């Protein structure tokens, strides 16, 4: 917790230093006319991004909240460990790849969609090839790996990780490329629609699970299938946006 706080504090301090530097260098260009123009020009960012971020956080936390309420703390702890371990490559590798990719296509701009399409296809292919082996290992040997690494009592977390691995594989491919494309091509409304569909999919799964009185395993299987399809079609949508702009 202390490390997290220090890390966040360091990031905020650096942000304010950079902000101060840019403000001093560009304050002479600020005018009421420019403020009004850019407020209108980029109004879609706060209008769609803020609710999108809220829905993203809601759908991400929904599984733990549902399992804590319906199945108890022990099962929730097992799922928490499984999702945390599977999310590490998405957080580390996916975030770094996404930032580098975003910087490259932002430099190119949306006026060269053919070049962006080629780059995006190459990045998605490399992400898939890079992730297919580790996620396949978790899919087939997750319970054994978790038992060896964390102990016998975390065997069930390995089972859950095995179930969730297909969905997190599709998320690993989608996340790095989506932010760049949807921002560069100014499709902020699409971001909101994608997050709405994820929330609806998530709550539909848990609603069915509750009505049918499913076990945690069956619930996670449907959840993993649902979100795998969600990210598959969301990735297709990203490529469709580029093609449509050609």
Task: Briefly describe each language-model feature range.
Residues 70-73, 184-185, 213:
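Helix-loop interface residues and adjacent transmembrane-helix termini in multi-pass membrane transporters
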Residues 82, 86-111, 178-184:
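Helix-loop junctions and terminal segments of transmembrane helices
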Residues 114, 140-170:
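Interfacial segments at transmembrane-helix termini and the short loops linking adjacent helices
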Residues 166-196, 240:
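Membrane-interface junctions at transmembrane-helix termini in multi-pass inner-membrane proteins
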Residues 1-23, 196-201, 215-240:
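Hydrophobic alpha-helical transmembrane segments
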Residues 3-4, 9-60, 104, 110-118, ...:
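Interhelical loop/hinge segments that connect adjacent transmembrane helices in multipass membrane
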Residues 43, 113-129, 136-140, 158-161:
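Interfacial transmembrane-helix starts/ends
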Residues 47-48, 63-64, 77-94, 126, ...:
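Alpha-helical transmembrane segments of polytopic membrane transporters and translocases
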């Amino acid at each position: 917790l202390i490390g997290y706080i220090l890390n966040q504090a360091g990031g905020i301090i650096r942000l304010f230093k950079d902000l101060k530097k840019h403000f001093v260098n560009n304050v002479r260009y600020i005018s009421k006319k420019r403020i009004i123009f850019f407020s209108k020009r980029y109004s879609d960012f706060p209008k769609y991004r803020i609710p999108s971020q809220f829905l993203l956080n809601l759908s991400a936390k929904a599984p733990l909240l549902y399992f804590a309420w319906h199945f108890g703390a022990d099962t929730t702890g097992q799922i928490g460990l499984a999702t945390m371990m599977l999310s590490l490559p998405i957080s580390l590798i996916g975030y770094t790849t996404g930032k580098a990719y975003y910087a490259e296509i932002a430099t190119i701009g949306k006026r060269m969609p053919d070049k962006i399409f080629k780059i995006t296809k190459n990045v998605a292919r490399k992400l898939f090839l890079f992730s297919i082996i580790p996620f396949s290992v978790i899919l087939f040997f997750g319970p054994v790996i978790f038992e060896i690494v964390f102990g016998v009592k975390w065997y069930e977390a390995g089972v859950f990780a095995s179930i969730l691995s297909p969905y997190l594989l599709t998320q690993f491919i989608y996340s790095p490329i989506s932010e760049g494309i949807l921002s560069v091509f100014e499709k902020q409304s699409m971001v909101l629609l994608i997050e709405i569909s994820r929330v609806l999919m998530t709550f539909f799964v848990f609603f069915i699970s509750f009505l049918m009185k499913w076990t945690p395993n069956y619930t996670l299987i449907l959840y993993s299938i649902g979100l795998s399809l969600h990210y598959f079609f969301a990735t297709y949508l990203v490529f469709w946006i580029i093609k449509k702009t050609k």
